[in-house]
Structures are given as structure tokens and as C-alpha cells.
């Protein structure tokens, strides 16, 4: 027998063999119970069920912090439409954020990655001595940093004392992005609310009292003023307020000003001045201005006083025009030293001295008149800003709020009346505290009189009298 004869029957047997593997899968009821438990103890709803409320979401893929004012369309710009009383900040990992002490509302957006313990807090007092000397205040800032992204809600008002957080103040946020090209001089001591940036520099400097020589030369060239422009004041310096805050470098800053986009219709506004463009502003409303370094503030601001119109010459209202008068040169003459000539010479010298004294008195009297007029008219705090500059104006000031709330009369407590044995006269309360009554007016046509207008409390008597007249006529 050959080999094929032995292999052939083996192949036929192997072709009829089949392998069967039985696997049993048991499904537990854990998922169904969890699903049922979630449906029973559900604590969230769909976003469509919450209307007219902006949803806050934490952002994960960020390299730099994101500032956004809530309730505005353009929350990242320094415009009036971006004013709001709450600021939302999305912070990337390992980036510190400094917020004013007592202004933190909420920390959110971290529950998906880690716990709240990842956020570290530290209290700092930057520029302690300079702020105490130049401004007479000390501001504490809370440093927040985390290894994971998180989000913050910041209020424009601070619960800490000394930050202008009274009940009469309405404050709004405005955001600034510093790219290193321009610096900002912040004149309000309570304006800096939140800031971030590793290369951001915040320093305190003294307010300049007088203008610079550069601005003095430009004023002499353009206006040809009679006054000595070397001693013109900037109008910013006062013993109550000696310094300002300078923001330089790169970073983001959240400022607050006295003004809100709701309520009384007030807000914070941005004004752009072109080259050699001028504007008059009340210095108490000036929140911030762009500068080029710490010594540039004296190159763009000068104190302004409204001139008084002279009644003797009402047509000449511009006091800055220099009218050149012809100068006559008188050659000295030799006189004989007689008694009469000496008397005349003394009289001339006395007359010249009296004229100089009168000119000095007139000069200071006119200055006192101008200062008094501007003070009484409320224009004593005006300054003139020369462009090119960017300005931030706040519609309200701390002084205006204090004045407004002082005007409102307070309810005086009523005097207590104690019973006595003396006889008292009864006062008719209806005469002093009479309640208004409603009267009904009607018109009657009487012969010989025409239309007669009358008023009554009730038409019943009038209707009866008219019916009686009709009955008498019918009879």
C-alpha cells in the first residue's frame, strides 16, 4: 500500500471534527442602579431652563490670563460700553493674579481637574512706604496662584476699609492691556483693583507741581502769554495728594472708577487726543492718562483758570494776547541842582514807585478775583491736557458723592409729648392735614348766563334739582 492510501482516510475524519467553545457572560445590575439613583437624586438642570443669566465656564487652554467684564458686549476694551461692576478672570496654570483685599467673590472652574486646595493665597502690601508717604493710604493685595487653571469673580467694591467702598459709591471696571509701548499714570488711589503679569511694574511717584521747560517753551511760542510760563502749575499737586501710580511693562490691569453703566446713567469714558489737541477736564474726574515714563506728566498738563471779563473793555476777553506797545527812549537830561528841580525829581521818583506798587496790587487783586470766581463757580479744579494722549474719565467723583448725600435731609425724630395737668387747646387736624377730595365738574346752560361750570362731590343733588325744575316747567 502506498502512503496516500493511509493519509486519505485520516483527512476525511479530520474534516468532520468541529471545535465548539462555550462562553457565558454575566451582566451585573450596578449600572442600572446607578442610573436610577442619578435620575432620582439629580441636582442639575439643562441650560435652557435658566434664562437671562450669563453662564460662567472655566477655560483650560490658556497661556495668558483673560479679563472680561460681565454684562457688556465689549468687556476687554477700555470704553464706556465695557463698564461693569463684576470682572471675570480666567487664569492659566502657574500665573499669579493680584486682587485687592476684600474684593474676591468666587473661585470656580477647578472641580474637573483637582480640588480647591490647589489654589494658593498670599497677602502682600506693594509699595508700602511710598503709598503711605505720597498718598496717605496702604492697600493690601491677595496673590492667587495654582498649578491648574481656575477662574475668578472680582467685585468692583472692596469689603476692606479705606478702599472707597462706601454705600454711596457706584464703581465700574475698565480693563487695560499694557504691551510695553506706553505707560499709564493712574491718579485715583483706589482705582487699581486687580493686575497680573510677570513683567508688569507698579511704582509710586510724586506729582509734579510745575510744568516742564519743554511745555513752557511751547506755550510761549504758541500763545505768546504775558505771564511767566516757567512758574505755571500743573494743578495736580496738593498736600492731601502727593503721588500717583505708574503702570509700565507688560500685563493686564483691572481699574475701577466712580461710574456705572446702570443706575444713574454714569460710566467710564475713553478720550483720544490728537497732536496739539487740547481739552479742559476737572482733575477729580481724571482716572488715568498715558505717559512716557515717570517724568512725562509735567509735559502735558497745566492748570487752567477761567478768565474774568473786564467790564471796562468787554470786547477784549482774551487775556493771553500780548499787545506790543511802542517804546519811547528818553535820553537823560542834565538839570541844575536847584531846590525846585530836586523837589520835582523826588515827586517823579515817588510817582514811579507809586505806579509800580499799584501795578503789583492790581496784579494780585486780579489773581485773587480770578481764584475767588473759579472757586465760587466750582471751576477751581480744572486742568488743560495737551495731546497726543489717551484719557480715562470717570463720570462721578468721591467729592460729588459726599456732597449729594449731605444734601439729602435726614428724618428728624419727632418730639415726645408728655401728659400734663395743664389745659391744652385742641388743634383742628383737618385744616393742617386735610386729605385731597375728588370733585366732579359739570356744565349747565342757563338763559342769560350761557355755559356755567360747577363742581360737586356727588351728582345726586344736582340730578334732583334738575328733575324738580323739569317738573315745574311741565306743570
UniProtKB/Swiss-Prot annotation:
User: According to its UniProt record, where is this protein mainly located?
Assistant: mitochondrion
What's the family?
Belongs to the AIM24 family.
Where is it localised? Mitochondrion
Q: What is this protein called?
A: Altered inheritance of mitochondria protein 24, mitochondrial
**Recorded GO CC terms:** mitochondrial inner membrane
Record organism: Candida albicans (strain WO-1) (Yeast)
Question: Which superkingdom heads the taxonomic lineage of this protein's source?
Answer: Eukaryota
Q: Write down the InterPro entries for this protein, in alphabetical order.
A: AIM24, AIM24_sf
Q: Which Gene3D superfamilies match?
A: Mitochondrial biogenesis AIM24
Amino acid at each position: 500500500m502506498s502512503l496516500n492510501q493511509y493519509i486519505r482516510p485520516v483527512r476525511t475524519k479530520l474534516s468532520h471534527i468541529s471545535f465548539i467553545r462555550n462562553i457565558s457572560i454575566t451582566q451585573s445590575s450596578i449600572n442600572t442602579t446607578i442610573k436610577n439613583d442619578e435620575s432620582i437624586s439629580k441636582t442639575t438642570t439643562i441650560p435652557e431652563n435658566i434664562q437671562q443669566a450669563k453662564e460662567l465656564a472655566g477655560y483650560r487652554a490658556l497661556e495668558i490670563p483673560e479679563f472680561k467684564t460681565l454684562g457688556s458686549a465689549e468687556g476687554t476694551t477700555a470704553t464706556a460700553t465695557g463698564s461693569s461692576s463684576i470682572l471675570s478672570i480666567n487664569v492659566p496654570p502657574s500665573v499669579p493674579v493680584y486682587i485687592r483685599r476684600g474684593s474676591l467673590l468666587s473661585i470656580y472652574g477647578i472641580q474637573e481637574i483637582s480640588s480647591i486646595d490647589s489654589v494658593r493665597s498670599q497677602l502682600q502690601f506693594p509699595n508700602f512706604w511710598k503709598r503711605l508717604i505720597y498718598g496717605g493710604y496702604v492697600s493690601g493685595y491677595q496673590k492667587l496662584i495654582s498649578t491648574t487653571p481656575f477662574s475668578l469673580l472680582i467685585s468692583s467694591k472692596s469689603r476692606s476699609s479705606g478702599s472707597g467702598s462706601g454705600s454711596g459709591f457706584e464703581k465700574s471696571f475698565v480693563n487695560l492691556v499694557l504691551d510695553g509701548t506706553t505707560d499709564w499714570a493712574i491718579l485715583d488711589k483706589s482705582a487699581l483693583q486687580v493686575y497680573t503679569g510677570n513683567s508688569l511694574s507698579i511704582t509710586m511717584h510724586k506729582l509734579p507741581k510745575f510744568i516742564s521747560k519743554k511745555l513752557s517753551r511751547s506755550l510761549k511760542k504758541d500763545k505768546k502769554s504775558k505771564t511767566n510760563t516757567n512758574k505755571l502749575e500743573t494743578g495736580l499737586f496738593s498736600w492731601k495728594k502727593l503721588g500717583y501710580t505708574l503702570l509700565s511693562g507688560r500685563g493686564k490691569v483691572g481699574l475701577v472708577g466712580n461710574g456705572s453703566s446702570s443706575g444713574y446713567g454714569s460710566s467710564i469714558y475713553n478720550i483720544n487726543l490728537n497732536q496739539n489737541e487740547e481739552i479742559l477736564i476737572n482733575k477729580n474726574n481724571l482716572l488715568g492718562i498715558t505717559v512716557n515714563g515717570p517724568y512725562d506728566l509735567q509735559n502735558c498738563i497745566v492748570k487752567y483758570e477761567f478768565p474774568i471779563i473786564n467790564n471796562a473793555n468787554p470786547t477784549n476777553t482774551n487775556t493771553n494776547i500780548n499787545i506790543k506797545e511802542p517804546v519811547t527812549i528818553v535820553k537823560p537830561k542834565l538839570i541844575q541842582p536847584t531846590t525846585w528841580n530836586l523837589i520835582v525829581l523826588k515827586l517823579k521818583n515817588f510817582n514811579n514807585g507809586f505806579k509800580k506798587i499799584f501795578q503789583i496790587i492790581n496784579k494780585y487783586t486780579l489773581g485773587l478775583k480770578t481764584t475767588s470766581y473759579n472757586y465760587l463757580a466750582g471751576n477751581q479744579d480744572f486742568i488743560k491736557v495737551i495731546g497726543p494722549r489717551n484719557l480715562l474719565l470717570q463720570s462721578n467723583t468721591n467729592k460729588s458723592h459726599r456732597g449729594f448725600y449731605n444734601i439729602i435731609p435726614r428724618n428728624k425724630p419727632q418730639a415726645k409729648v408728655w401728659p400734663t395737668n395743664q389745659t391744652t387747646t385742641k388743634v383742628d387736624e383737618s385744616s393742617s392735614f386735610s386729605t385731597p377730595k375728588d370733585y366732579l365738574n359739570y356744565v349747565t346752560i342757563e338763559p342769560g348766563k350761557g355755559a356755567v361750570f360747577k363742581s360737586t362731590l356727588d351728582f345726586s343733588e344736582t340730578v334732583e334739582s334738575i328733575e324738580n325744575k323739569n317738573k315745574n316747567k311741565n306743570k
